[in-house]
């Protein structure tokens, strides 16, 4: 009789213990492995990467400033140096950001200047050339005492409009970011500059 009672007590305790374990499992779930910490990404790694300048060397040998034209694709953020319908070179750009969109349509190169400087955007610098305030507009910002305006460098500049919009070397973050100009890589801007002339047609739009 005592053995039977002891057996019943053990069975009861086992049932209670099993129910308790199951309840805890349902409440907290199985132990999950901790996720592996991910290394912090540099800010530069978050910038959209653009394919570099591509050049068709065989077509480049045929290119002259008399037979080339330029096509700029705003959606693709690419500029094309072309002979007829054939692409001689294809390079990354950064066009005008929202509110400062690059003017679209059929244009021509109005001026070539290998060492152009902006008359509107640049920095305020002191007498020693030290930048006191960067990224200013000569139109809307006041120069601190003892400083003067130094226009931003726009190397290998190709003027497209009378009010100063053109193609030139600039920072390429992978999206439209300029004040209206069409920025190019150093190698792209130099190549385009070398193979066009004043009067070369330039088409800017949704190509």
Residue ranges, per PLM feature:
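N-terminal pre-domains immediately preceding structured catalytic cores
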Residues: 2-207
